[in-house]
Swiss-Prot record:
Main function: Catalyzes a salvage reaction resulting in the formation of AMP, that is energically less costly than de novo synthesis.
Natural source organism: Synechococcus sp. (strain RCC307)
EC number assigned by the record: 2.4.2.7
Protein name: Adenine phosphoribosyltransferase
GO biological process: adenine salvage; AMP salvage; purine ribonucleoside salvage
Protein family membership: Belongs to the purine/pyrimidine phosphoribosyltransferase family.
Reactions performed catalytically: AMP + diphosphate = 5-phospho-alpha-D-ribose 1-diphosphate + adenine
Amino acid sequence: MAESLEQQLRALVRDVPDFPKPGILFRDLTPVMRDPQAWKQVMEGMQQSLAGLQPEVIVGIEARGFIVGTSLAMTMGLGFVPVRKPGKLPGPITAVDYALEYGSDRLEIQEGALSGCQRVLVVDDLLATGGTAAACAELVSRAGGAVCGYGFVAELTALGGRSKLPGGVLVESLIHY
């Protein structure tokens, strides 16, 4: 019996206990990215599950969302727009501040990066608590775009990140923990 894509990818993901702090089990996706055949399968799997949304542009969240986002944008023949942490983008920016478990953070996008009501697919490597992805959705809206869906390589389902994302918008993940 052939292994599913999720099973194949799970076999490559490295579990790192107590990183970045004690009690955390870090799911390291870099072995998947290092394997060209596996990474190609990730992009093909994401394209198949998300193409029906008919996105016009992909927004990737700093930092690993840049890797996923640019790869998927090339696969789908779309443009890519980076959403960055503070102070990394030149020129006028639009920003959103958001709360974290341990404080707050900020995401920024260049003004004019999205055209009015452009259909945006938000991507990142991992969906955990959903706070950053929800903040990115707010930022996309402020910048004039409309989130049509979310794509993640992996999802930590026990953390309930999907519940923080706007209802009625497709959320796809290839690997579920």
